[in-house]
């Protein structure tokens, strides 16, 4: 780290830099997923299968709404990474200030809309009647906590854009440990049920955001802004929106397909919902390395594009994809032997139907993890390069795939069809993303050549 607690990713071995930057991210994501797993285990084991299904039934809509907020925050950090790579401190600070103001506005709007529409959303999703009330209790708290989500994601994005992936992870780990403790306190001691599980999530994330504020105030002068930096500038706001909104919509568009799929699975009953919930939680844990590599590539490509080092972007993408593919093969082989034991963490072995369906879902998805590697590495690389719109279209491909499975095949073939929804989504997204990356790289290289030629 430099004196500004930042790291320059424009020099040095791409593979070494990617591993060094992604490992702290991976550690944080693993802790986050450990919390998610513990949360699900506590709900499933100490409350009921109905409570597990209720929390699981909200997963796709949470992904749609919370994912939009996270995507926007991630997009807002990309111009900052580019300005850091270009050594433009004045522009960097202006983006930091403007992103903060715009994020406050987004937080207010999103919180108000989602809280007001919470009940209607669950009805539209065909939530089973026996879990509707529990699902509402959980979802309303998550929506009310959107400002806490935006606070942490925005500030951690600021830090990562400067090459600092360690501090956000430390605060995330603190939040995850706190979250587990609060889960146990609220559910086992205070008997707050699924409401307590949601409240623990929001409270711990808010604390992690406050920790980011304290750290930045004390240790990162590069992110300190003046009153002038907080005045909205139309050109800066426009660039933030060009980067942030496509990333937010990418998450939401992808999630729309997940919502449609979840709605179809909801129609199969609580057993199917619980099965997909357990398997999805395990899968989310297993794919953390892909998410870490993706987040790394966004910062890596952003800094290198800012420094006009486009060939390093290509080399970095290849390195990240190879690392992820090797891991994919290893984890699939491991799951062949341990999948059922992981499922037993969520439900009793006596729940044979849930175990069988969860096993089928998990192994089917794991077989297609290599396409998922490419989705993460290529998409985030394109976003870091400044072409967020292309990444959004990949989200459309994923939405189409999941919607097709949910609307057409699940009603005919049942739960087995749902198992292939994500694999099909990943393959269709890759069919768009790989050519899009080649196009974006050529476009940047051509622009650089034109600038050089114009000097002579």
Residues covered by each model-derived region:
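Short alpha-helical transmembrane segments in multi-pass integral membrane proteins
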Residues: 1-22, 80-145, 189-245, 301-368, ...
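Helix-terminus/linker motif at the lipid-water interface of multi-pass membrane proteins
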Residues: 30, 34-52, 122-129, 185-192, ...
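Hydrophobic transmembrane alpha-helices of multi-pass small-molecule transporters
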Residues: 64-67, 179-183, 209-213, 285-288, ...
């Amino acid at each position: 780290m430099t004196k500004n607690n930042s790291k320059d990713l424009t020099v040095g071995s791409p593979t070494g830099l990617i591993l060094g930057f992604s490992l702290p991210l991976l550690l944080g994501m693993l802790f986050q997923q450990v919390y998610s797993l513990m949360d699900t285990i506590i709900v499933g084991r100490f409350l009921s299968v109905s409570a597990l299904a209720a929390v699981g039934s909200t997963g796709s809509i949470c992904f749609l709404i919370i994912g939009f907020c996270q995507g926007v925050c991630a997009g807002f950090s990309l111009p900052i990474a580019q300005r850091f790579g270009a050594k433009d401190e004045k522009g960097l600070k202006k983006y930091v200030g403007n992103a903060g103001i715009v994020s406050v506005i987004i937080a207010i709007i999103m919180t108000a809309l989602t809280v007001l529409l919470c009940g209607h959303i669950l009805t539209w999703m065909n939530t089973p009647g026996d879990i509707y009330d529990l699902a509402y209790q959980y979802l309303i708290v998550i929506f009310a906590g959107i400002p806490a989500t935006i606070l942490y994601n925005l500030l951690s994005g600021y830090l990562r854009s400067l090459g600092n992936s360690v501090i956000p992870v430390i605060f995330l780990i603190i939040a995850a440990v706190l979250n587990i403790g609060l889960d146990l306190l609220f559910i086992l001691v205070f008997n707050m049920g699924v409401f307590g599980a949601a409240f623990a999530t929001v409270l711990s994330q808010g604390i992690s955001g406050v920790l980011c504020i304290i750290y930045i105030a004390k240790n990162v002068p590069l992110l300190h802004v003046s009153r002038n930096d907080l005045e909205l500038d139309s050109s800066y706001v426009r660039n933030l929106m060009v980067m942030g909104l496509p990333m937010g919509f990418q998450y939401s568009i992808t999630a729309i397909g997940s919502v449609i799929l979840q709605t179809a699975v909801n129609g199969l009953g609580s057993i199917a919902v619980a099965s997909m919930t357990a398997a999805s939680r395990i899968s989310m844990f297993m794919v953390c390395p892909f998410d870490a590599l993706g987040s790394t590539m966004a910062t890596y490509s952003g800094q290198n594009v800012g420094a006009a080092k486009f060939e390093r972007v290509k080399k970095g993408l290849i390195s990240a994809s190879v690392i992820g593919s090797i891991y994919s093969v290893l984890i699939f082989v491991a799951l062949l032997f341990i999948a059922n034991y992981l499922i037993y963490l969520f439900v009793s072995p006596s729940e044979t139907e849930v175990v069988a369906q969860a096993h089928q879902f998990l192994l089917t998805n794991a077989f297609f993890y290599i396409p998922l590697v490419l989705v993460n590495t290529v998409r985030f690389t394109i976003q870091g390069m400044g072409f967020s719109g292309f990444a959004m279209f990949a989200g459309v491909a994923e939405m189409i795939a999941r919607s097709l499975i949910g609307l057409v095949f699940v009603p005919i073939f049942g739960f087995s069809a749902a198992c292939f929804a994500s694999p099909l989504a990943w393959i269709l997204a890759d069919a768009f993303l790989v050519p899009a990356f080649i196009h974006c790289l050529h476009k940047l290289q051509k622009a650089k050549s034109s600038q050089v030629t114009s000097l002579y």
